[in-house]
Amino acid sequence: MPRSRVNGNFIDKTSSIVANILLRIIPTTSGEKKAFTYYRDGMLAQSEGNYAEALQNYYEAMRLEIDPYDRSYILYNIGLIHTSNGEHTKALEYYFRALERNPFLPQAFNNMAVICHYRGEQAILQGDSEIAEAWFDQAAEYWKQAIALTPGNYIEAQNWLKITKRFEFE
């Protein structure tokens, strides 16, 4: 039984019912429908902190999904799980792959910037200011891309860029 049918939350049940109705009436292939079901189940498992189950669902969705735009969101969510697990190198890889398919994902740029900023802070703690600056510069580049896509968002990043003189805003 798909995961989405067993969740007890009223909102999740309602969302699942609506999604199932849409899957029946929207003209899509059976493969696309299966991919969406795995994606939806992956999101549900991820929201509950069941990362291993979420990854299994996302990998199955990736196997079935052919649309690059839809694949970008699957890859992005896989990146989120690796970020949550502290697997930053893997997370960056998945964010890059998501952006290759959909360059308009500001949240992927933001998450990449956060990882780079974190690595910069870790380099400072290890006494390597040169490496730290390189990580901070990379974080700045990713934040600039995220901000360019959604200028009203990422206010903390904008403030950090101003304070560190890495970017001037108009």
From Swiss-Prot:
Gene name of the encoded protein: ycf3
Membrane topology: Peripheral membrane protein
Repeat (TPR) residue spans along the chain: 35-68, 72-105, 120-153
Source organism superkingdom: Eukaryota
Subcellular location: Plastid, Chloroplast thylakoid membrane
Family annotation (SUPFAM superfamilies): TPR-like
Descriptive protein name: Photosystem I assembly protein Ycf3
Alphabetical list of Pfam families matching this protein: TPR_1
NCBIfam families registered for this protein in UniProt: PRK02603.1 (NF002725)
Functional description taken from the UniProt entry: Essential for the assembly of the photosystem I (PSI) complex. May act as a chaperone-like factor to guide the assembly of the PSI subunits.
Family according to the record: Belongs to the Ycf3 family.
Gene Ontology biological process: photosystem I assembly
GO cellular component: chloroplast thylakoid membrane
Keyword Transmembrane helix: no
PROSITE patterns attached to this UniProt entry: TPR, TPR_REGION
Major location (coarse): plastid
Entry keyword set: Chloroplast, Membrane, Photosynthesis, Plastid, Repeat, Thylakoid, TPR repeat
